[in-house]
Design a protein with these regions (language model features):
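Active-site-proximal cap/lid insertion segments
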Residues: 1-6, 22, 26, 43, ...
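N-terminal FAD cofactor-binding segment of flavoenzymes
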Residues: 33
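His/Cys-centered metal/cofactor-coordination and adjacent catalytic loops
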Residues: 45-83, 137-138
Length: 312
């Protein structure tokens, strides 16, 4: 999508081999409502999940504001039909890895149509253990060697599932925790982007959005390292499809659940030319990347300007 600071060769290749959507929108500018919309095809007002799960409820609101936040459902109802349940009923093997954030235990991926769950729990970020590095402290993801990187682990789990189900239809949903806070990158990647930042002469520049600062330049080395690690993980999964000869018969979709974090929690990225970011209903909060590759069905290198949304 044109960044000159972040490096994403796997995603760039995916765009060249499929369609790049320029007007794709999340159902909500925060995570849980959009994730529920992806799983169900329903808008947030239909699922009742209208804020991120864990957000303050009206009775717990402590800020002096004119309005209270609206109440919301804190889990995806089990009687709501999910994409995983539909595909499982159609004979697909179903697999989930990464961030779930759609309810407490009993409402996790294995309760919503997924045969296997690697890392999907109630948390919105990797807040247990050493977070983005093993030991993870995640009850649905066994610890790897000390220092193992979470995006790489989730990609390898996904690749292993694909290989073991190569001879039957499968639905593999890899929902990275990246690039959610906490901001943590591999040291080699952080150093790479610190050097790139210096070489390009980039410095932090700021604007204002209401009462908050907003970052105007992409130059945050840790965030850039997180983006590249995610891209490397995407490449791992795509390479597995190629190794197994499954590229031609596999639909690949890459998207996100809200805009980049530009106005809080470290202000790590910029969404310019779009206004604001995650948490805001401006373009910066809801316009998303969307890449679709389906050989023989989707024209390689095509660009789609038609507006689409996550329930689609």
């Amino acid at each position: 999508y044109g960044s000159t600071f972040y490096e994403t060769p796997a995603l760039d290749q995916l765009a060249q081999e499929g369609a790049r959507f320029t007007a794709a929108y999340a159902a909500c500018p925060v995570c849980s409502p959009t994730r529920a919309s992806i799983m169900t095809g329903l808008w947030p007002q239909r699922t009742g999940i209208t804020d991120y799960i864990g957000a303050p409820a009206p009775e717990a609101w402590a800020r002096n504001t004119l309005l209270l936040p609206a109440p919301y459902m804190d889990r995806l109802a089990l009687d709501t039909l999910t994409l995983a349940e539909l595909l499982k009923d159609a004979g697909y093997a179903t697999f989930f890895a990464g961030k779930w954030h759609l309810g407490p235990e009993g409402w996790w991926p294995e309760d919503q149509g997924f045969d296997l769950n690697r890392g999907g729990i109630d948390r919105g970020g990797p807040y247990g253990g050493n977070r983005y590095f093993s030991p993870y402290g995640n009850p649905r993801l066994s610890d790897g060697p000390v220092g193992e990187h979470l995006p790489d682990r989730l990609a390898r789990e996904t690749a292993a599932f694909i290989e073991s189900h190569r001879d039957r239809p499968f639905f593999a949903y890899l929902a990275f925790y990246s690039v959610h806070t906490p901001l943590m990158a591999r040291e080699d990647l952080r150093q790479k982007y610190e050097e790139k930042r210096t070489r390009l002469g980039l410095t932090a520049q700021w604007g204002r959005e209401d009462t908050r600062d907003v970052r105007l330049v992409q130059e945050h080395a840790v965030y850039a390292g997180m983006v590249e690690a995610l891209d490397l993980a995407v490449g791992t999964v795509l390479a597995k499809l190629d190794d197994l000869g499954l590229r031609e018969q596999t639909l690949v979709i890459f998207t996100s659940d809200n805009g980049g974090l530009a106005t809080s929690e470290g202000w790590p990225t910029s969404n310019l030319p779009w206004r604001a970011g995650k948490g805001w209903l401006y373009e910066g909060g809801i316009r998303e990347p969307l890449l679709v590759r389906w050989p023989g069905k989707v024209a390689a290198g095509s660009v789609v300007d038609t507006p689409v949304s996550s329930p689609d």
